[in-house]
Structure formats: structure tokens, C-alpha cells
Amino acid sequence: MEKFRVIGSTQPLQGEVTISGAKNAALPILFASILAEEPVEVANVPHLRDIDTTMELLERLGAKVERNGSVHVDAGPINQYCAPYDLVKTMRASIWALGPLVARFGQGQVSLPGGCAIGARPVDLHIHGLEQLGATITLEDGYVKAHVDGRLQGAHIVMDKVSVGATITIMCAATLAEGTTVLDNAAREPEIVDTAMFLNKLGAKISGAGTDSITIEGVERLGGGKHAVVPDRIETGTFLVAAAVSRGKIVCRNTHAHLLEAVLAKLEEAGAEIECGEDWISLDMTGRELKAVTVRTAPHPGFPTDMQAQFTLLNMMAKGGGVITETIFENRFMHVPELKRMGAKAEIEGNTVICGDVDRLSGAQVMATDLRASASLVIAGCIAKGETIVDRIYHIDRGYERIEDKLSALGANIERFRD
């Protein structure tokens, strides 16, 4: 099993890093390509395990998939309608295959998905949305099966709970429905906006993406087109936090400040100097005092849950007691016991973690438990005294492209090895 060996240093991380395309936009866009009867080209797709799995899944369905810089998908030849367990078990995002399959072909089935073990992420909202569009859904032998005679039908859907995943499922399925769908209490994340932009380039008629009310006028077919995936705001935030806790200075390229305004505001509150350009963000923490901040995760445009673990580490290294409250997912403080193994001070009370400050962490053997938690452990290793071994780094490979190379370019001492 692969691991990271990180040798900590008191030297600040400095330099430039190029941000990859957003996994959380690339995945739904690749699944949405199932809807297209003509070839599509998707640029700025990160090289990640989940992307590779998605491409393999599309090929299993019968699509022609090729990667030479951009990802090219021809979903015209699709003749299979089942996302099998052997692929789906590793990736929760595979549920996004269901809506496009039933919308275009009238049938689809997806094995109940896997992914990060960070609490309840039920597929009920996906299922209920497809049912409201006229699909018949059954659960059999561990598979979610969807069927419709003819086309799905447009509907007015009010989501019981704000859900990024279900918003994407319903929006994609409704593009080929007969009539107009209005989706209220929709999620507003930038990745939803990006998916809608992609679909509109193929001939969909979607308006309101990025607000809590999305309108989709159904069309009979989608054609081909080209699209570049939006930059990864979570990767951007992760590297900015890495620079902040190391008292460094970095520039993130190929990213946009409007994607992570809540994160930038908290970094400034923590004492960082932030500057932004059209496609770059810089952070300077040189000679500045890191101050603890109070964070409460919330749906976009609030503070993203995917940055919670990184800010937990920031608060542990900052002056003053920081409090972080997680409102999106349960069981998302699994990084805290691992950081405490490195000497961090923190107490978990329900959905809140209260951090105390320490002068410096100490290297230790730690275990990654989910994607974002693993990033916080790697950053902790960069600033700790001595050697840190991060185990189960397959989690980090699901969401960060070449993180060890990018950190090394900033001055970190990190290597991947297999024992």
C-alpha cells in the first residue's frame, strides 16, 4: 500500500502552484456526457482515480472514451445501462449515471455507491427527484433501478434538503424531459453552474444555476460540444492554508477568487494578506501572526465543508482557541484523533471541534480516513518536527492531482513510497 513520508520543516512554503480542474465539476460533467448523442470534448480534467473510474464506467456502458490532453467522450454507441458494483463500490459519484441513463434511454441501474466514509449521504433525494420526473425506481439486489415509458416529464420539484448531488441528478435528467422543470431549494455550488454551462453548450436550456431556483426546459436531444472544467476551489483553499500555517507566501494560478470568497475571508481574518487577479490568488503570511477563527460550514456560498479539516489544522496552529462547527455531514472529524497523535490539542463536542494552540506538532504515523482529512494530515506533516508517515493515501489520490509534486515545488520534503 502506498504512503507518504513527510519530513517537517520550519521553512515556509513558498512559490507558485497551478490549480487543477475541479473534480466535483469534472465528474458530473463526464456523467452528463451520457445525455449527448454526439461527441463531446472536456478540457482541464484532473488526473485522479475517480476520473479514471468514471472513464472506465463510461466505456463499460459502451461509450468511446479517449484522453489526449482533453477527455473525449462519444456516448452515441452506449448499449449497456448498468453501472456495476465492481466499479461503483469505490466511488459515490457513480449515482450520477442514473439520471442521464433513464433520461436518454428510458432505463438505468446503478449499484448502491461507495466513496468516503463520512456519515450519511443517502441517495433518497436522487431517487425522489427522478420519481417526480416520472421514473419508476426499485431497489433490487443492491442496485437502484430506474425505468420510464417514453420520456420523463417536467415537474415542479421542491427539494426537502439542499443537496449538491441530487441537484445535479435532477438537473441532468430534466434536460431531456418533456416540458419544463422548476427545481426549488436547489444547491448553488459553482460546480453546478459549471455542469449547467456544459449542458447548455450541448443544446440544453437551463437557467438559474447558481441560485436556489433552477429552470430546465426539456429538449428532445443533446448534441456535441467543447467545455473546460472550472478550477478546483478546494485544492486552491488547501494550498492557501498550507502556506498560511507554514507562514509562507504562495501564488495559486489557474483559479478564481469568486469561487471561494468565504474561505478567503476567513484566511484574511486569520491574519493572511490576500491579493487576487483575474486567474490567480496570492497569500502572504510572512512575519504575520496566525489567529484562530470561528468557522461554521454551510451550503454555498457559505463556508465549504470540504475545507473544514484544513481549517481545523489552521486553528490548532493559531493563537487563541478556534471553534469549528460542521453542519453538513456527520462523522467528519476523523482527522482530529490523528492530528492529536501529532501533539495537537482539540476536543470534539457533538458537531463542534474546539482547538487549542500548540507551538509545533511532532511527526507521527497517521492514517488518512477520507479525502479532505488526508490533506490536513499531509500539511501537518510539512510543518511538524521530524518524520510523518501518512497511510492509506488512496483517499488523497481521489481528489488531489500530484499533491506531493506540487508541495515539493513549494519547498516541502515529501515522497510517495510503497512498503
Swiss-Prot record:
Record's keyword terms, sorted: Cell cycle, Cell division, Cell shape, Cell wall biogenesis/degradation, Cytoplasm, Peptidoglycan synthesis, Pyruvate, Transferase
MF term (GO), any: UDP-N-acetylglucosamine 1-carboxyvinyltransferase activity
InterPro entries: Enolpyruvate_Tfrase_dom (IPR001986), Enolpyruvate_Tfrase_sf (IPR036968), MurA_subfamily (IPR050068), RNA3'P_cycl/enolpyr_Trfase_a/b (IPR013792), UDP_GlcNAc_COvinyl_MurA (IPR005750)
Pathway(s) it belongs to: Cell wall biogenesis; peptidoglycan biosynthesis
GO terms for biological process, alphabetical: cell division; cell wall organization; peptidoglycan biosynthetic process; regulation of cell shape; UDP-N-acetylgalactosamine biosynthetic process
UniProt enzyme class: transferase
Positions that bind UDP-N-acetyl-alpha-D-glucosamine: 92, 121-125, 161-165, 306, 328
Keyword Lyase: no
Keyword rRNA-binding: no
Record EC number: 2.5.1.7
Positions of the catalytic residues: 116 (proton donor)
Superkingdom of this protein's organism: Bacteria
Compartments where located: Cytoplasm
A Pfam family per the record: EPSP_synthase
Catalytic activity of the protein: phosphoenolpyruvate + UDP-N-acetyl-alpha-D-glucosamine = UDP-N-acetyl-3-O-(1-carboxyvinyl)-alpha-D-glucosamine + phosphate
GO CC entries: cytoplasm
UniProt binding sites for phosphoenolpyruvate: 23-24
Sites bearing 2-(S-cysteinyl)pyruvic acid O-phosphothioketal, chain numbering: 116
Biological role stated in the UniProt entry: Cell wall formation. Adds enolpyruvyl to UDP-N-acetylglucosamine.
Family indicated by similarity: Belongs to the EPSP synthase family. MurA subfamily.
Protein name: UDP-N-acetylglucosamine 1-carboxyvinyltransferase
